[in-house]
């Protein structure tokens, strides 16, 4: 799903750079699909990887967003706690020819409005 979404965005905006903020959902999914997530996320120009949204799950020892992050080959990548996202976004430089997307099934959607408003002030 992530790979298909990012590929579609690339096709829609072929001359633009792609920046993605991704929040993994569930410890079990992160554990089971870390390699696939890393491969899909390596196709962006800049990656902001957030901590795992646990939903109903308890943490699994050794399962953090780091297991995805270490295998991502995107040219620029950063690992953040979701509480750090807005401060990070205040300092990020996005070019005119850049698309920014949020991806995830956790609570990353609550950042869409604030990020959009922030990016408008930078335009």
Question: For the regions a protein language model found, what residue spans apply to each?
Answer:
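ATP-dependent carboxylate-amine ligase
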Residues: 1-123
């Amino acid at each position: 799903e992530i790979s298909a979404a990012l590929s579609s965005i690339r096709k829609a905006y072929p001359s633009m750079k792609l920046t993605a903020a991704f929040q993994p959902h569930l410890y079990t999914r992160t554990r089971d699909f870390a390699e696939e997530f890393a491969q899909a996320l390596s196709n962006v120009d800049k990656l902001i990887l957030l901590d795992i949204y646990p939903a109903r799950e308890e943490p699994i020892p050794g399962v953090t967003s780091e297991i995805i992050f270490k295998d991502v080959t995107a040219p620029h990548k950063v690992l953040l706690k979701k509480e750090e996202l807005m401060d990070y976004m205040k300092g990020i430089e996005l070019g005119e020819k850049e698309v920014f997307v949020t991806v995830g099934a956790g609570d990353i959607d609550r950042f869409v409005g604030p990020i959009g408003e922030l990016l408008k002030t930078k335009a």
